[in-house]
């Protein structure tokens, strides 16, 4: 059996880039909670003892930007200079302007357009991906790297590993084989964890704790063997971290946010953007489409692309590729996708309820991935169900003599109470 290796990485919530993503999305949450029609394009950057929030925001909400910054930093664990940033003492700079009137008139007509008329906030192309290799319909390499990062944070905050500090990175290499276009995991080849720590712990203690409290609870035993390689804090020292160790900026972890290098990426970041920004809403709807295709058994693996022009509601293109794993031709799957998913930005917003802020809804997306999460706030993860009735009908027609076909079809029409249901393969409701 010929196999290949594929690697995905992740970073946890204390990484400076992820800190910025979380602040940007915390601002978005605050705006949408008070004013669902807020137009938000919020960026954040950070370096030693400083956080800056900047961008374009048009909202009726009364937002205390400095408080959001400090609360977000504190909740992550940046509570002293020793760990890389002190939430209560750092400088907070704010430079927010209104959305450009040129953009406003073209996209939403200064709030006068109906939802179906709202145009895309910018040009661009977005990708959604799904695979049947995990229950989350996500790539295993990405799932494991992401869960390791989340587990690092969990054992830091619950005191299991008190020597841990907020910053950290993970990486997992999985050995796969190709099963007629589908990807089947065989084993975990390599696990890499680099985590910030205090001065009190030895490298041997770090390695032992990471294996026992982080790796073992996350990676299923069936994927680990005597050949699995572990690189645990291979640099030998990681005391200086967070914004003290590296500058951070919103939107620099877009592969970690999505599929860990699988599928494709259009280049647009998500955090700090309201749903008129198709970088975010477009990526969410094509994830739902791709996941629905795989979850309904139409394919084992699928990528969906959508593209937009600024100010134009209808997408310029929609594309589907099942990598040869489709149960029916890709052109038929594309037809089903177009019939069941509305790719206009205003309608995506309604169908996925993307104007709803609060409850840290978008803040939750800003660490540990936007996809594959079991959370009711992640509405784009809801699979549109399939009936599959016409596929069964096709099988009956093949095996039953022609003289009975009209009778069978008539009976089925009465049972289904709709001739249309018989015509459409795998119709998603």
Curated annotation (Swiss-Prot):
Q: Which GO terms describe its cellular component?
A: cytoplasm
Name the cofactor(s) required for activity, per the record: Mn(2+); Mg(2+); Co(2+); K(+)
Alphabetized Pfam families for the sequence? S-AdoMet_synt_C, S-AdoMet_synt_M, S-AdoMet_synt_N
Q: Is the Cytoplasm keyword given for this protein?
A: yes
Where Mg(2+) is bound, by residue? Answer: 9
Query: If you read the UniProt record, what top EC class would you report for this enzyme, in one word?
Result: transferase
Write out the residues that bind L-methionine. Answer: 56, 99, 246, 277
Domain of life, per UniProt, equals: Eukaryota
* Pathway annotation: Amino-acid biosynthesis; S-adenosyl-L-methionine biosynthesis; S-adenosyl-L-methionine from L-methionine: step 1/1
CDD domains referenced in this protein's UniProt entry, alphabetically: S-AdoMet_synt
Q: Where does ATP bind?
A: 15, 167-169, 235-238, 246, 252-253, 269, 273, 277
Q: Where in the cell is it found?
A: Cytoplasm
Query: Entry cofactor note text?
Result: Binds 2 divalent ions per subunit. The metal ions interact primarily with the substrate. Can utilize magnesium, manganese or cobalt (in vitro). Binds 1 potassium ion per subunit. The potassium ion interacts primarily with the substrate.
Give the matching HAMAP family.
S_AdoMet_synth1 (MF_00086)
- Family assignment from sequence similarity: Belongs to the AdoMet synthase family.
PANTHER family given in the database record = S-ADENOSYLMETHIONINE SYNTHETASE
Function noted in UniProt: Catalyzes the formation of S-adenosylmethionine from methionine and ATP. The reaction comprises two steps that are both catalyzed by the same enzyme: formation of S-adenosylmethionine (AdoMet) and triphosphate, and subsequent hydrolysis of the triphosphate.
Name listed for the protein in its UniProt record: S-adenosylmethionine synthase
């Amino acid at each position: 059996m010929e196999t290949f290796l594929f690697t995905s990485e992740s970073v946890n919530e204390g990484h400076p880039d992820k800190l910025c993503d979380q602040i940007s999305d915390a601002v978005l949450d605050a705006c949408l909670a008070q004013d669902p029609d807020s137009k938000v394009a919020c960026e954040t950057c950070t370096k030693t003892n400083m956080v800056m929030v900047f961008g374009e925001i048009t909202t009726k909400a009364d937002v205390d930007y400095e408080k959001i910054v400090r609360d977000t930093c504190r909740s992550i664990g940046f509570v002293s200079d020793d760990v890389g940033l002190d939430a209560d003492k750092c400088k907070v700079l704010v430079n927010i302007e209104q959305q450009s009137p040129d953009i406003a008139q073209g996209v939403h007509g200064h709030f006068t357009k109906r939802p179906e008329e709202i145009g895309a906030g910018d040009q661009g192309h977005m990708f959604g991906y799904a695979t049947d290799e995990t229950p989350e319909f996500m790539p295993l390499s990405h799932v494991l790297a992401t869960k390791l990062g989340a587990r690092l944070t969990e054992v830091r905050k619950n005191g299991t590993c008190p020597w841990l500090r907020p910053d950290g990175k993970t990486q997992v290499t999985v050995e796969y084989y190709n099963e007629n276009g589908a990807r089947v995991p065989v084993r975990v080849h390599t696990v890499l964890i680099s985590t910030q720590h205090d001065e009190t712990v030895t490298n041997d203690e770090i390695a032992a704790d990471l294996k026992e409290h982080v790796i073992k609870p996350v990676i299923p035993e069936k994927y680990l063997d005597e050949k699995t390689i572990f690189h645990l804090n291979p640099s030998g020292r990681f005391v200086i971290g967070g914004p003290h160790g590296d500058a951070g900026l919103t939107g620099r972890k877009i592969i970690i946010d999505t599929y860990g290098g699988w599928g494709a990426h259009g280049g647009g970041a998500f955090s700090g953007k309201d749903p008129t920004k198709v970088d975010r809403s477009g990526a969410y709807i094509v994830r739902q489409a791709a996941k629905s295709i795989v979850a309904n058994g139409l394919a084992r693996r699928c990528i969906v692309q959508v593209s937009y022009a600024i100010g134009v509601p209808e997408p310029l293109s929609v594309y589907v590729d099942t990598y040869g794993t489709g149960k029916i031709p890709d052109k038929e799957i594309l037809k089903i996708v177009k019939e069941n998913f509305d790719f206009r930005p205003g309608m995506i917003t309604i169908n996925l309820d993307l104007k709803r802020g609060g409850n840290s809804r978008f803040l939750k997306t800003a660490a540990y991935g936007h996809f594959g999460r079991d959370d009711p706030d992640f509405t784009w993860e809801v699979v549109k169900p399939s009936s599959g009735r016409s596929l069964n009908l096709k099988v009956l027609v093949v095996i039953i003599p022609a003289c009975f076909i009209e009778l069978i079809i008539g009976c089925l029409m009465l049972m289904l109470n709709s001739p249309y249901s018989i015509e459409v393969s795998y119709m998603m409701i």
